[in-house]
Amino acid sequence: MRDETPEQPAPLRFGYTTGSCATATSLAAARLLLAGQADDAVEIVLPKGQRVMMRLEFCRATADGAEAGTIKDAGDDPDVTHGALIFARVALAAAPGVRFHAGPGVGTVTRAGLTLPVGEPAINPVPRQMMTTHLEALAAEHGYAGGFDVTIGVEGGEALALKTMNPRLGIVGGLSILGTTGIVRPFSCSAYIASIHQGIDVARANGIAHIAACTGNASEDAMRAHYQLPDMALIEMGDFAGAVLKHLRRAPVARLSMCGGFGKLSKLAAGHLDLHSRHSSIDLPLLAQWAAEAGANEALQAAMRAANTSQEALKLAQADGVPLGDLVCAHALRVARDIVPPSVAVEMFAIDRQGRFVGAAR
């Protein structure tokens, strides 16, 4: 019998950003006002020149203008806004230019440190430019010399925003309208890394000199309890230790505490800046070597090398009086100090699965 050809996995689908959705819907609403044309799809040009056609859910006149909506398609990316209705309401204005407003589900900036001034709707610069470019071209096409008031909204955006970093960044009332290329790349890390950078920038702009970068909820709780730090000082770095350390080169703070599970910290100690299991693994022989330098006997070293997990290796070392947690933190500290400016005072903390400190280095 002939063997079947193995099925090839389908390539992951790209999607479109909330900025692209806002551009398409604002253009459609404005076109209805200027040309009397109600589209069911609209073509937009992305920042790198690609032309894409975006389907609309509705395009209709309102009492004071027009509105259009589209369903956000993030492709195969697990985006919190995937499937959300993004809409624009456009009104014509006598004064030229484009003015942006936060509609339902779009947040407002309340803290300094972001790319937008306090009080502005959380519609980022590239989406603003995309909308402005398209609306100005439409106005020129129809000989219109006035301006536009553009209100962007996201259905259910206030609840969705609670699943993002917006509340901690001081963006209240909803989501941000984002995107630099107009395209969502599946499982891209860029949005998460951008939120890390924004968190640091907001902390700096609000006078916070001591930040704590944490790998998860347990480490965040440990830092909050240990130092009584405000939420604004807590940076949720996840696996992206390198994103924190490298950003501090150009945006330094006086003091950085890094805290994570023992396994995550052992990866950083070995020189890995991405702590995800896809990109780095725990080096048990290296842990055994460090334990040996602290006096571990041959039997303990062999047991550590044969351990199933880093937690097991840690418990073996603890039972023998070897301060493996402190050793790992000391090596992680050296890695961090090689990256951040000398002006940044750095310290490391490792916790176990119960959130208890098992190592520290300063």
From Swiss-Prot:
Keywords: Cobalamin biosynthesis, Methyltransferase, S-adenosyl-L-methionine, Transferase. The keyword S-adenosyl-L-methionine applies. The keyword Acyltransferase does not apply. GO terms for biological process: anaerobic cobalamin biosynthetic process; methylation. Its EC number is 2.1.1.195. Pathway: Cofactor biosynthesis; adenosylcobalamin biosynthesis; cob(II)yrinate a,c-diamide from sirohydrochlorin (anaerobic route): step 6/10. GO terms for molecular function: cobalt-precorrin-5B C1-methyltransferase activity. InterPro entries: CbiD, CbiD_sf. It catalyses: Co-precorrin-5B + S-adenosyl-L-methionine = Co-precorrin-6A + S-adenosyl-L-homocysteine. It is an enzyme of class 2 (transferase). Belongs to the CbiD family. This is Cobalt-precorrin-5B C(1)-methyltransferase.
